[in-house]
Design a protein with these regions (language model features):
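Helical element adjacent to the flavin cofactor pocket in flavoenzyme catalytic cores
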Residues: 138-143, 163-221, 225
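Flavin (FAD/FMN) cofactor-binding and adjacent substrate-gating region
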Residues: 1-8, 74-81, 104-180
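Extreme N-terminal leader/targeting segments of oxidoreductases
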Residues: 1-26, 44-45
């Protein structure tokens, strides 16, 4: 099933698949928003090769909600209770900084991706869950004053029991944004290859050999920016995974 965002892909060219051996400073494996963002920043300073097994901005990056927020459900009270206030504060500040970084990239690179500042809400229609939301709001307030507030109404045509309203959040079109990053990467004299599935990575004489489509990319550094680590050893992550699906309306 294709997401609403992925309909936009037809307006962008397909990058060629890798066809020969090559050398680079950094090889980024994975063409989602994480891989593209990593390659974007690195390409300003060094040569980068990005490899994507399918099309860039597919799967998770092409099917997300388009939210650019530090509001991730009812989460911060749990984070404070389980990891401590200082850890939770660093997590919140990192997410808020990420919002500002994306805003700067969109502005500086003139990426047309429908970026817009918005409020973000987490709400409930159940009176029994109101106290949980109020505790969450107080928890966030301990980390950053005036970032959010508890409200009884939201900007949607529905009855609610209560909500937390986060200020200074945003939304964008993830596929348009991803292809905007890709254009910047190529303009920085780095390379992107689609339909180029990495099958193995070996370290030989201090370098990394990345094997893909019967070809080899030799790199000083490798960044694995895939949904999960695809190298079986030592983690055997494929044995620890479970399937999860969510939907947004």
């Amino acid at each position: 099933m294709q997401s609403f965002w992925e309909e936009e892909r037809k307006n962008y060219k397909e990058y060629e698949s890798i066809r020969n051996d090559m050398k680079t400073s950094v090889c980024v494996v994975g063409g989602g928003l994480t891989g593209l963002t990593t390659a974007y920043y690195l390409s300003k300073y060094t040569n980068v090769v990005l490899l994507e097994r399918d099309r860039i901005c597919s799967h998770t990056s092409g099917g997300n909600t388009g939210k650019v927020t530090s509001q991730h459900g009812v989460f911060y009270k749990y984070l404070i209770d389980s990891q401590g206030k200082e850890f939770a504060k660093k997590y919140l500040k990192a997410n808020q900084k990420a919002i500002e970084n994306i805003s700067k990239i969109v502005q500086n690179e003139k990426i047309d991706c429908d970026f817009k500042r918005e409020k973000a809400y987490v709400f409930t229609a159940k009176e029994t869950e109101v106290d949980k939301l109020k505790k969450e709001q107080r928890a966030v307030d301990k980390l950053e004053k005036d970032l959010c507030q508890y409200v009884n109404k939201i900007e949607l045509p529905m009855e609610i029991a209560g909500a937390i309203e986060f200020r200074s959040q945003a939304k964008l079109h993830p596929v348009k944004y991803g292809y905007g990053l890709a254009k910047c990467i190529v303009n920085n004299n780095s390379r992107i290859y689609e339909n180029s599935q990495v099958t193995d990575i070996k370290k030989v004489d201090g370098k990394y050999e990345v094997y893909v489509n019967k070809n080899k990319v030799t790199a000083d550094y490798v960044v694995i920016a895939t949904r999960y680590p695809f190298i079986k050893i030592p983690g055997y992550y494929f044995l620890k995974m479970y399937q999860s699906t969510s939907y947004a309306i």
